[in-house]
Design a protein with these regions (language model features):
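Catalytic nucleophile loop
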Residues: 119-122, 145-166
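C-terminal and late-domain segments of enzyme folds
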Residues: 20-63, 168, 173-345
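N-terminal beta1-alpha1 cap of cysteine-dependent amidohydrolase-like domains
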Residues: 21-121
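Catalytic-core regions built around general acid/base machinery
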Residues: 111-114, 134-149
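Glycine/threonine-rich flexible loop motifs
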Residues: 125-135
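Short, solvent-exposed loop/turn and secondary-structure capping segments
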Residues: 79-80, 130-131, 164-166
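A residue-level signal for conserved active-site and pocket-lining positions in enzyme catalytic cores
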Residues: 66, 118, 156, 206, ...
Length: 345
C-alpha cells in the first residue's frame, strides 16, 4: 500500500506541474482576423477607465482582436470592451499571466502575436517586470508596436511600465519625501530601456494616480535620476485618476477626462533644457543627499492640461514646447524641498 500511495502522490505532483500556467477569458469570434491596425498608445492614470479614451484605443484595432493582460483578476474588461462601448471588434481575450512559465506558454505567445491591440490592466508593476520581462510577452508586445504597428495601452501599473524608463516598484512603494531626501533611496527603483521598445515613448517616464499631491515631488525625483543616470533629456507624463493621454501617429497627446464637471488633469513635465537647449542636470543628485534641481526656480516646465470628453486639449510631443488648453508652471527643488510657481503669460 505504501508503494501504491507513493506512486499516486508522484503522479499527482507530475500532473500538477503540467497544469495550465495561465488563465484565459474569451468573448467574441475565435477565428483570427488580420485587419491593419493603427499605431497608438493610451495611458490611463488609474481608477475607473475613461470611456472616450477607451473608444479611441479600441478604434485603433480596426475591428481586430484585443488582448488584455494581467497578473491577477479575471474578465472585468471583456464585456466592457466587446459590447458596452459601441466599437466593433472581433474579440476580447483576457490572459492572466502570473509567472514566467505562463509568459512563455505557446498559447499566450500565439494570442499576443495575433492581437491588433493589447491592454495592460492595473496591478503591481513589479510583477509585470518580474514575470513578463525577457519573455515571450514583452517580445510579442514589441512586435505589436514595431512590426504590426498596432495599439497598446494600460492603466495604473499598466501605464507605469510604458516608458523607455519606468518606476518598477521592485522593493517598496516610495513617497515624495523619501525620494527628495535621497533620490537613490533603495525604493527608487528605475528600469531603463529593457521592457517596451516604443518609439512614441523614447525619453519618457510616467507616473499615475497623480491627484495624490504627494506624487509631484517623487516624479521630479524619478526624472532627475533619468537625466543624471542616462545623461539624456527625459520628459515625464503623469495622469490623475479617471484621466487618459492618447498619442497617435501625429504625436499629439490628447487628454481625456471629465472636465469641467471633474478636475481631471494630465501633466507633461519637461526639464527647461528640453525647451531651451543645452543640458542642465540637477545641481545635486547624489546617493544619500537631498535633491536640488533649481536653476533659478526654472528647472522644470510643466504643462498641465484638463482632460475633456472629446480630447480636444493636447500637448505636442513632437516639439514638447506647445499645447492647447493647458497652463504652464515651474517646478523646482531646493535641498529636498519641492516648490511650484506660475509662469507669466
Amino acid at each position: 500500500m505504501k508503494i501504491i500511495y507513493t506512486f499516486i502522490l508522484l503522479l499527482s505532483i507530475s500532473l500538477s506541474a503540467q497544469a495550465q500556467s495561465y488563465t484565459s477569458y474569451f468573448i467574441g469570434d475565435t477565428a483570427d482576423v488580420n485587419p491593419s491596425p493603427s499605431s497608438g498608445i493610451c495611458l490611463m492614470g488609474g481608477a475607473t477607465e475613461d470611456d472616450s479614451a477607451m473608444k479611441w484605443f479600441l478604434n485603433k484595432a480596426n475591428g481586430g482582436d484585443v488582448v488584455v493582460i494581467r497578473v491577477t483578476g479575471s474578465d472585468g474588461y471583456n464585456n466592457y470592451m466587446y459590447s458596452q462601448l459601441g466599437v466593433n471588434i472581433n474579440s476580447v481575450e483576457t490572459l492572466v499571466i502570473p509567472s514566467v512559465a505562463a509568459a512563455n506558454d505557446p498559447y499566450v505567445r500565439k494570442q499576443l502575436r495575433n492581437a491588433e491591440a493589447v491592454w495592460i490592466a492595473g496591478g503591481n508593476q513589479a510583477n509585470y517586470i518580474n514575470f513578463w520581462n525577457n519573455t515571450s510577452v514583452d517580445t510579442a508586445l514589441n512586435d505589436l508596436i514595431n512590426v504590426k504597428q498596432g495599439v497598446i495601452g494600460g492603466t495604473s501599473a499598466g501605464m507605469a511600465v510604458q516608458g523607455q524608463a519606468y518606476y518598477s516598484a521592485l522593493n517598496n512603494s516610495v513617497t515624495s519625501a523619501a525620494t527628495l531626501a535621497n533620490p537613490y533611496n533603495s525604493d527608487v527603483t528605475i528600469g531603463y530601456n529593457d521592457f517596451l521598445d516604443n518609439p512614441k515613448m523614447k525619453g519618457i517616464i510616467t507616473d499615475t494616480h497623480f491627484d495624490n499631491p504627494d506624487r509631484k515631488g517623487r516624479f521630479v525625483g524619478f526624472i532627475a535620476r533619468c537625466v543624471k543616470d542616462y545623461n539624456k533629456h527625459f520628459v515625464g507624463i503623469a495622469c490623475d485618476e479617471y484621466t487618459a493621454v492618447c498619442i497617435g501617429s501625429d504625436m499629439l497627446a490628447r487628454v481625456y477626462g471629465g472636465h469641467p464637471t471633474y478636475d481631471d488633469n494630465a501633466y507633461f513635465v519637461v526639464p527647461d533644457s528640453c525647451i531651451n537647449g543645452g543640458m542642465y542636470p540637477p545641481e545635486t543628485c547624489i546617493s544619500g543627499q537631498p535633491l536640488t534641481w533649481n536653476h533659478n526656480n526654472q528647472a522644470i516646465r510643466v504643462y498641465a492640461v484638463k482632460g475633456t470628453p472629446n480630447g480636444s486639449n493636447h500637448f505636442d510631443m513632437n516639439t514638447k514646447k506647445t499645447g492647447v488648453g493647458g497652463t504652464w508652471k515651474n517646478w523646482y527643488v531646493n535641498s529636498g524641498n519641492f516648490s511650484e510657481g506660475s509662469i507669466p503669460t
